[in-house]
Amino acid sequence: MYKVSACGVRIMSGISEIWIGELRDYKYALRLDREEYPAVLVYEYDSSSTRNYLFTIKYSDQRPNWQLITRDAALTAYDLLNRGGEFTTLSFPGATIHRSVSELSRLH
């Protein structure tokens, strides 16, 4: 089941969540399960241990080594945010990263 956000991005119920720190370890990235969860919500912790939701990764097709592509895409998007950049959609082979600050802020 999908919910449509104000900006038209579909937020899925039953979405998996992952801490960005876990994706830095490629062995953890290999445990991602796209069959159980069609998308992943990536977050970081702020200084008070509150989750700060960053973006959603939605899988578009199955490719060899898709877990590592997902990991690299997430780390690229995270680096962009840490450098002061902003985006709404980034496309990678087999995955699309969506960021809607207004939608993500409602998840807290």
UniProtKB/Swiss-Prot annotation:
A Pfam family recorded for this sequence: MBB1
Source superkingdom: Eukaryota
Function: May be involved in metabolic processes.
Name assigned to this protein: Uncharacterized protein MBB1
Organism of origin: Saccharomyces cerevisiae (strain ATCC 204508 / S288c)
Gene coding for it: MBB1
